[in-house]
């Protein structure tokens, strides 16, 4: 048998889907192929890696995927990947196919899975795929800017009816435990104030803030992060609405939910993805392994796992103060 000369990479998407994941597959495949690297896709994330669900990239038609949301290769929750024997089988599946490098597109849990695989000798690269923007090694994550656009579009629609009927609108956005979607969404839509995990408001504080806004105008639009109301002793949004309605502040609740994952990636999103994908393939060409790729000021950057995991989150208190200046 002749010795293997062509490098092989496997790519998987993991965690919650994010707009731009498909575009990342497209760009990685394009740049890898032009560098004479053979590409495989792993279906259904780490679940598929364990179950050996690898297919050559040329078997999937990506021609309509650049502008589509979701992930055409799937993503499944797979808590069993925490078990060493499961990861060992996943690593063995890569080894038997002579895969040289694994590229993981996902959030912080996906990154940890890659780090654990790297400890078993798998050469890994991670790209930040999550709408939550909670990967500290990247200024913006893949999907965040597009989710932000979906918030802008939906809040714009909510604003018109809220103003027409002189109401209070509470718009809940995603973000898990990161407030960036709420903060940047509030900035993009000129919302009256914002509530995030770093500036939580109880019912009394929320009511006081709304009343301050209503002193100057007949409507109020509030953007709140998910996982605040209805948790840790805070009233549910339904209870808040009932309280406001009973106190002559008619309230509409709008939870944007998974619509934030469903928009086609924006132009800037695609530009950043293209640059990060090219950077990833360049790192593979240099055999600089076990790297976390991100972007800073629209320039691709890379760090090793320990560097990336030890980066602190960005302090958004100044931005929150700007948004909430009328309720302070």
From Swiss-Prot:
Enzyme Commission number(s) of this protein? 2.7.1.11
- Catalytic activity entry: beta-D-fructose 6-phosphate + ATP = beta-D-fructose 1,6-bisphosphate + ADP + H(+)
Pathway-wise, it operates in: Carbohydrate degradation; glycolysis; D-glyceraldehyde 3-phosphate and glycerone phosphate from D-glucose: step 3/4
Q: Which organism is it from?
A: Mycoplasma pneumoniae (strain ATCC 29342 / M129 / Subtype 1) (Mycoplasmoides pneumoniae)
Q: Which residues bind substrate?
A: 130-132, 167, 174-176, 226, 258-261
Summary of subunit composition and partner proteins = Homotetramer.
Family named by the database record: Belongs to the phosphofructokinase type A (PFKA) family.
Name this polypeptide is given: Probable ATP-dependent 6-phosphofructokinase
Q: List the disulfide bonds.
A: none
Q: Name one GO biological process term.
A: fructose 6-phosphate metabolic process
- Output the Gene Ontology terms for molecular function: 6-phosphofructokinase activity; AMP binding; ATP binding; fructose-6-phosphate binding; identical protein binding; metal ion binding; monosaccharide binding
Q: Give the domain of life.
A: Bacteria
Active-site annotation:
132
Enzyme class at the top of the EC tree: transferase
Chain residues that bind Mg(2+): 108
**Reported cofactor(s):** Mg(2+)
Main location, first listed in the record: cytoplasm
| InterPro entries cross-referenced by the UniProt entry | ATP_PFK (IPR022953), ATP_PFK_prok-type (IPR012003), Phosphofructokinase_dom (IPR000023), PKF_sf (IPR035966)
Q: Which Pfam families match?
A: PFK (PF00365)
User: Can you tell me which residues bind ATP?
Assistant: 16, 77-78, 107-110
Keywords for this protein:
ATP-binding, Cytoplasm, Glycolysis, Kinase, Magnesium, Metal-binding, Nucleotide-binding, Transferase
Q: Which GO terms describe its cellular component?
A: 6-phosphofructokinase complex; cytosol
């Amino acid at each position: 048998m002749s010795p293997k000369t062509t490098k092989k990479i496997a790519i998987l998407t993991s965690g919650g889907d994010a707009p731009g994941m498909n575009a990342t597959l497209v760009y990685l495949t394009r740049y890898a192929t032009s560098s004479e690297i053979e590409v495989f896709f792993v279906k259904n994330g780490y679940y598929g890696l364990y179950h050996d669900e690898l297919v050559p990239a040329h078997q999937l038609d990506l021609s309509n995927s650049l502008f589509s949301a979701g992930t055409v290769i799937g993503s499944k929750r797979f808590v069993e990947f925490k078990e060493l024997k499961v990861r060992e089988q996943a690593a063995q599946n890569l080894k038997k196919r002579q895969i040289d490098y694994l590229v993981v597109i996902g959030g912080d849990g996906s990154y940890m899975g890659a780090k654990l695989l790297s400890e078993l000798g798998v050469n890994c690269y991670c790209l930040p795929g999550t709408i939550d923007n909670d990967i500290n090694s990247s200024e913006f994550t893949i999907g965040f800017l597009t989710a932000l656009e979906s918030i802008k579009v939906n809040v714009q629609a909510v604003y018109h009816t809220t103003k027409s009927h002189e109401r209070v609108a509470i718009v809940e956005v995603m973000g898990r435990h990161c407030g960036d979607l709420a903060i940047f969404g509030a900035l993009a839509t000129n919302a009256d104030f914002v509530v995030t995990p770093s500036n939580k408001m109880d019912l009394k504080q929320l009511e006081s803030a709304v009343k301050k806004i209503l002193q100057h105008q007949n409507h109020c639009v509030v953007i709140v992060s998910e996982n605040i109301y209805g948790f840790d002793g805070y009233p549910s949004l339904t209870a808040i609405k009932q309280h406001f309605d009973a106190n002559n502040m008619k309230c509409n609740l709008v939870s944007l939910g998974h619509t934030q994952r469903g928009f086609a990636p924006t132009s800037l999103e695609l530009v950043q993805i293209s640059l990060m994908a090219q950077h990833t393939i360049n790192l593979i060409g240099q055999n600089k392994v076990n790297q976390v790729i991100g972007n800073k000021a629209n320039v691709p950057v890379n760090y090793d796992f320990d560097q990336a995991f030890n980066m602190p989150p960005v302090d958004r208190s100044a931005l929150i103060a700007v948004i909430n200046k009328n309720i302070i």
